[in-house]
Design a protein with these regions (language model features):
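Acidic, Mg2+-coordinating active-site environments of NTP-dependent enzymes
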Residues: 5-161
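Generic hydrophobic secondary-structure packing signal
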Residues: 114-117, 134, 167, 171, ...
């Protein structure tokens, strides 16, 4: 991205990944911050998911220091405030407050993190000139990304089977917690952590699986 003019960039969150390259989470965050400190144009915009704690606050501070246009989204957001989220059978209902108006959105995606990603994406559209009402209205037309809480099949007993790319502790936790509100019976998890790049995440993922799923099957 260093050779490209970037009008707007977004920060969602930071979780354990790529530590085989960066060494620790602090170095990883420093590398991510270069997007906002060096790559975004001086007259550009930054969209921040405001609910990621210290990391969100640090990106917000940097955007203000550089004088960039700042849009914040989420429950603590001021540009797009997530006032309410209600999970349904095939998606979720969102109530968004923006520009003094309340918008009711039927989002055909499962999980809190997918609502977060959708709002951050909407923020990027708005930051680059999109109309707020039109942008939020179009969220109801989104389609799930393959391999991201993708419903693969429904078994003969009526149980839906979902496939997700989750390969970090945070991602696994988010996927299970996203599915739990839609689960009427047992939640059965099949997962693995192959390869030798970051073996330190395996016990964390195992603990999350044991705590949040009803049955766990570990693959090799």
């Amino acid at each position: 991205t260093e050779g490209l003019p970037v009008r707007a960039a977004a920060f969602t969150n930071l979780s354990r990944d790529h530590l085989d390259y960066h060494g620790d989470i602090a170095n990883y965050f420093t590398a991510k911050m270069r997007l906002f400190s060096e790559v975004v144009d001086s007259d550009g915009a930054v969209v921040v998911w405001a609910d990621a704690g210290e990391y969100s606050a640090r990106v917000i501070d940097l955007a203000r220091e550089r004088g960039l246009a700042l849009l914040t989204v989420g429950e603590r957001g001021s540009t797009l405030r997530l006032a309410e989220r209600s999970p349904g059978q095939l998606g979720q209902q969102l109530i968004i407050e923006a520009e003094g108006k309340t918008h009711k959105i039927s989002l055909p995606l499962i999980g809190a993190y997918q609502a977060a990603n959708a709002l951050v994406a909407a923020g990027l559209v708005i930051a680059t000139g999109g109309d707020v009402s039109t942008t939020l209205g179009n969220l109801s037309r989104l389609q799930p990304v393959r391999g991201r809480l993708e419903r693969a099949v429904i078994t003969q007993s009526g149980a839906p089977v979902y496939v997700d790319y989750a390969h970090t502790p945070d991602a696994l936790e988010a996927a299970i917690e996203a599915l739990r509100p839609h689960c009427k019976g047992r939640l059965i998890l099949v997962f693995g952590a192959g390869g030798d790049r970051d073996t330190g995440k395996r016990p964390e993922m195992g603990a999350i699986a044991a705590q949040l799923a009803d049955n766990v099957i570990v693959t090799d």
